[in-house]
Amino acid sequence: MHGVTITELIEKMHLRNSTPQIDTDKIVLTHPDVNRPALQLTGFFDHFDRERVQIIGYVEQAYIKTMERDVKRQMFDKLTSSQIPCLVFSRGQEPDDDLLEYCNYYGVPCLVSDK
């Protein structure tokens, strides 16, 4: 299987790893596209391409901040349990502690870009 490991992505894109306990050498990206999971944050997972890197941008983060904690935790559980390769937060935004809990549980690297 050809692809790029999450470790290579971290190094080439100068990302910070918020989940360093996850072995990113074992996760290989095989899909060149990315996804911004706006609809998935609302609970809609039909036609969700879980092979793509998931990007949490400013709009997605703003929406997450409006959610009640129990709803947010349910959404984080569903998103991270769907076997996505990783999550990337853009513009230096920090992931929620509850999200990091689920990322660690399901082995999903959570990365942060300063750009």
Question: Where are the model-predicted features located?
Answer:
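Long, charge-dense
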Residues: 106-115
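Short, well-ordered alpha-helical microsegments
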Residues: 95-99
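Short acidic/polar active-site loop segments enriched in Thr and Asp
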Residues: 85
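Acidic-aromatic/histidine active-site loop/patch
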Residues: 92
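Gly/Thr-rich phosphate-binding loop signature of adenosyl cofactor/nucleotide-binding cores
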Residues: 1-80
